[in-house]
């Protein structure tokens, strides 16, 4: 694989050491700053400085100069203080020992700089301290800096106690056999290198960079161990200590490189194009190159190595990255291991209970070379969503320290098959999906946070801790649940298998299902062993409309001893002491099957012989379990029909057959009616029973439209009515109530014949407003709208038996139709009125006794009567739809009625009347009605 370019890195290895050419073996003598110097060529391209004449004063600091001082071989001389502008190149330790110290705010400025230049040259430049005003000691090299330039040279640069150095570039150990050392130490101590591609630590020789105690280096591209045979070492140590290259870092380019990030230090790469632009770290770049990087801390402070692009461990050479206790390595994109076929890459993630190394990356990618990844207590942390987080790793052993995965709020997938006997831990928010067959991993797995989704096989025991989740469609070992287990895939339904025992220790189970019949799709937890403890189960209905079950929907399968309890945690209501969940028209309870010990969601009555107090008669055999709103909705339709029934003529206006003869006598009337009912339908889906208390007020006017002197007349009328009722509903599925307000109008037309014949026709329109409640589920519907209309015709004839006594046979036919507006109840079930029609015939006979009298000059008339009726219903009652499930109700077809009443009239204008009726269906239902009214003519 082609290596990334070094651009200008090679341009600065060697520069002419003086102002004269040394391209041949010729010698030249010249005067440099008062020193006679001969340039003598030992071999082409390499100068040697020979001092021919100089005075000792040339090397001594100026009198009184305390901030810039030099000793030994420092060129050019003399050293100026406190601010020395060299005007050319600076050499400290050309061929002998030399030191230059810049302290207490002093400054030096030069072109190029050589510290430890030629063979035998030992140079030390120390930059330290600040002045009294806080101004740092400063060294500025406009060109490159070579520390340990030629073979046999040894150079040292020390930047201490807040000193600041700046240069174009830097090379430590430029030639084979040279040694270059840089120490940047102390808060505020800085070395800034301006060129993007030129910072070599061990170019051909040995280079060492040490940054500690808060020192910082800002450089271009960093290369540690550039050429073959070179050796580079970089140690960045201590909190606030930092190396921040504006380009890539190469550790072991062609030579040997080592980078240590320790005790809270920071090393970070980013490109110069913009802040945060990508730059990578290469460890073991080319064939023959060997790089080692270790990130760790013993102080508790986190050491950080970060690349704004990739970390490459073994590009074509040999690379090793170790992230140990207290270390954090970050690859903004990916971490590659052993990329080229010639490479060897080793990634060590180490740690223990006292601290763990962390590699934060988008993914770890296995290359074509020799790959070694040691998961030994360190943490792999994701920094993006990634479906193939361990890319290319078909198998992976887990070392003694264990594998630790931190999804860090991301969605991460791993298809690797793990093996080992230690531990596997899921950390952090987010989801880790394991799809490989890790049956060979027999150690303990802990889900400490976030979600572990197992779609493959994970051997060994599993512990789900509080706040964590285990999900998936695969297989795990014996499981302890302190958190949440949610079988199934991300979408759809599926089963998670626990190959072993299950122990509930405060955890819960989440199940998604499509609530319907026995074959409904559902998530399921399969336990091959035994169960212990109590587990709350939260069931989420995914689009299920409800249906009657037989055996039920199996959600927990237990193959072993089923001693554990699974209890529905999110029931919509409680029935018979069991929480129940509503889907459409049905309620579902979670039950253990007495045969197989597994757990099922069932929409069936579990104890049909034990209805709720006050409930209606349940079905003879266990039937469906309807949700608590259904009996109320059934009763709602029946109540509307009962409240829409039409009265008889005599109930409405009393007995007008005895009004004074003659046309022109119009009238007005008002009546109040009250009733109490107990209705036990002959046909009822829910076995509900209703108790209705009703009050109604009706006011009307009559006008004689035609009349004869013989007493026959045609009377037209119009009445308005208003009423309120309270319905109490009882059912094995749950009790409830309905509060109804109604109003309407009734036009009438009545013919009274002179021979005792009458014919009465009436029509009625009513509008309803109802509030529906369930005792188990609370409010079902407020302000439910409904309407009805009805027609009735009644006819009869009075036959005189003797003076004042008459027998009145009569018959009536009424038709009523009711409908309510459809609505969605609190559970989301659609409730619709399907039909609500009644066609009732009544045949009866009344015995009427009348007496006339006069008192105080006022005519008075009174009559009392009794009536006996037989009623028959010809239609089938009401039918509603609850989530497309038909719910029907019909009262008994045949009823008997007994009524008594009285009229009292005076002054030929006024009358009061009343009637009490009792209706019964001979099977327990009854209605008692009382009405009282006042009528006047004018």
Roles of regions detected by a PLM:
Residues 84-90, 109-115, 140-147, 166-174, ...:
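Extracellular beta-strand/beta-solenoid scaffold signature
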Residues 29, 49-55, 114-115, 564-609, ...:
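C-terminal low-complexity, acidic/polar tails when present
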Residues 63-110, 404, 408, 412, ...:
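N-terminal segments that cap or nucleate solenoid repeat domains
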Residues 329-332, 344-350, 355-358, 374-377, ...:
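Extracellular beta-solenoid/beta-roll
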Residues 512, 619-637, 663-667, 671-938:
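Membrane translocator/pore-forming domains, dominated by Gram-negative outer-membrane beta-barrels
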Residues 4-5, 14, 18-25, 29-30, ...:
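Outer-membrane translocation/initiation segment of Type V secreted surface proteins
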Residues 88-90, 100, 112-113, 143-145, ...:
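Short, T/G/N/S-enriched strand-turn elements that build extracellular solenoid repeat scaffolds
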């Amino acid at each position: 694989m082609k290596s990334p370019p070094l651009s200008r890195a090679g341009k600065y290895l060697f520069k002419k050491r003086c102002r004269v050419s040394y391209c041949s073996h010729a010698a030249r003598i010249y005067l440099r700053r008062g020193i006679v110097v001969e340039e003598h060529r030992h071999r082409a391209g390499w100068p040697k400085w020979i001092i021919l004449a100089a005075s000792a004063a040339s090397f001594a600091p100026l009198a009184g100069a305390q901030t810039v001082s030099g000793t030994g071989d420092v060129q050019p001389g003399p050293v100026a203080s406190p601010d020395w502008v060299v005007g050319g190149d600076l050499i400290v330790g050309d061929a002998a020992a030399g030191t230059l110290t810049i302290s207490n705010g002093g400054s030096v400025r030069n072109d190029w700089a050589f510290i430890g230049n030629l063979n035998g040259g030992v140079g030390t430049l120390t930059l330290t301290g600040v002045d009294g005003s806080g101004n740092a000691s400063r060294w500025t090299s406009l060109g490159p800096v070579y520390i340990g330039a030629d073979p046999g040279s040894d150079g040292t640069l020390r930047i201490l106690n807040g000193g600041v150095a700046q240069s174009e570039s830097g090379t430590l150990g430029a030639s084979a056999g040279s040694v270059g050392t840089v120490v940047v130490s102390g808060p505020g101590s800085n070395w800034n290198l301006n060129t993007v591609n030129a910072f070599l630590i061990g170019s051909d020789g040995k280079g060492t960079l040490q940054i500690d105690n808060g020192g910082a280096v800002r450089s271009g591209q960093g290369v540690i161990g550039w050429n073959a045979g070179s050796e580079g070492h970089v140690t960045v140590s201590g909190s606030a200590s930092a190396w921040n290259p504006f380009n890539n870092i190469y550790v072991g380019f062609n030579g040997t490189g080592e980078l240590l990030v320790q005790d809270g230090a920071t090393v970070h790469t980013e490109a110069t194009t913009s802040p945060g632009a990508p730059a990578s770290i290469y460890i073991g770049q080319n064939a023959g190159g060997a790089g080692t990087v270790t990130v760790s801390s013993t102080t508790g402070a986190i050491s950080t190595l970060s690349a704004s692009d990739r970390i490459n461990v073994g590009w074509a050479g040999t690379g090793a990255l170790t992230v140990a206790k207290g270390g954090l390595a970050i690859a903004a994109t990916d971490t590659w291991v052993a990329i080229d076929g010639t490479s060897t890459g080793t990634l060590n993630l180490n740690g223990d209970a006292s601290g763990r190394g962390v590699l934060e990356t988008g993914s770890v990618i296995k290359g074509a070379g020799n790959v070694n990844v040691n998961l030994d207590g360190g943490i792999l942390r994701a920094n993006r969503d990634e479906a193939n987080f361990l890319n290319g790793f078909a198998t992976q052993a887990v070392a003694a320290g264990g594998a630790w995965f931190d999804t860090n709020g991301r969605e991460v997938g791993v298809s690797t098959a793990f093996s080992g006997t230690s531990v596997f831990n899921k950390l952090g928010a987010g989801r880790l999906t394991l799809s490989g067959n890790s049956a060979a991993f027999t150690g303990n797995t802990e889900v400490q946070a976030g979600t572990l989704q197992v779609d493959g096989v994970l051997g060994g025991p599993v512990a789900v801790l509080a706040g964590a989740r285990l999900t998936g469609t695969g297989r795990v070992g014996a499981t302890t649940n302190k958190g949440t287990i949610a079988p199934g895939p991300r979408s759809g339904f599926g089963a998670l298998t626990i190959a072993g025992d299950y122990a509930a220790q405060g955890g819960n189970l989440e199940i998604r299902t499509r609530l319907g019949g026995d074959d409904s799709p559902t998530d399921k937890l399969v336990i091959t062993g035994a169960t212990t403890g109590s587990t709350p189960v939260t069931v989420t209905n995914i689009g299920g409309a409800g249906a009657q079950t037989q055996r039920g929907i199996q959600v927990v399968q237990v193959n072993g001893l089923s001693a554990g309890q699974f209890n529905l945690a999110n029931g919509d209501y409680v029935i018979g002491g069991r929480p129940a969940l509503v889907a459409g028209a049905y309620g579902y309870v979670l039950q253990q099957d007495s045969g197989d010990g597994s757990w099922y969601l069932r929409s069936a009555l579990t104890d049909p012989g034990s209805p709720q107090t006050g409930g209606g008669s349940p079905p003879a055999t266990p039937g469906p379990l309807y949700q608590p709103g259904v009996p109320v909705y059934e009763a709602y339709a029946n109540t509307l029909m009962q409240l829409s029934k039409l009265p008889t003529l005599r109930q409405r206006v009393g007995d007008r057959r005895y009004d004074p003869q003659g046309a022109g006598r119009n009238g007005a009337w008002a009546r109040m009616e009250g009733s109490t009912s107990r209705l036990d339908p002959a046909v009822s889906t829910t076995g509900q029973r209703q108790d209705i208390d009703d009050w109604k007020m009706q006011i009307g006017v009559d006008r004689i439209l035609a009349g004869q002197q013989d007493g026959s007349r045609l009377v037209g009328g119009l009445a308005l009515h208003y009423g309120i009722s309270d319905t109490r509903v009882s059912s094995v599925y749950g009790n409830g109530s309905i509060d109804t307000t109604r109003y309407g109008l009734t036009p009438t037309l009545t013919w009274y014949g002179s021979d005792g014949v009458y014919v009465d026709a009436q029509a009625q329109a009513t509008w309803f407003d109802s509030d529906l409640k369930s005792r188990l589920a609370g409010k079902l519907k407020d302000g439910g709208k409904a309407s009805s209309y009805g027609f009735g015709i009644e006819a009869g004839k009075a036959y005189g038996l003797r003076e004042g006594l008459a027998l009145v046979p009569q018959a009536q036919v009424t038709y009523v139709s009711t409908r309510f507006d459809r609505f969605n109840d609190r559970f989301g079930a659609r409730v619709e009125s399907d039909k609500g029609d009644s066609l009732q015939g009544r045949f009866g006979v009344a015995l009427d006794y009348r007496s006339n009298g006069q008192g105080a000059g006022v005519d008075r008339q009174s009559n009392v009567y009794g009536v006996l009726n037989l009623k028959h219903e010809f239609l089938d009652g009401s039918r509603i739809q609850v989530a497309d499930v038909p719910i029907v109700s019909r009262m008994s077809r045949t009823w008997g009625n007994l009524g008594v009443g009285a009229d009292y009239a005076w002054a030929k204008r006024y009358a009061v009347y009343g009637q009490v009726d009792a209706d019964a269906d001979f099977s327990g239902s009854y209605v008692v009605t009382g009405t009282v009214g006042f009528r006047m003519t004018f």
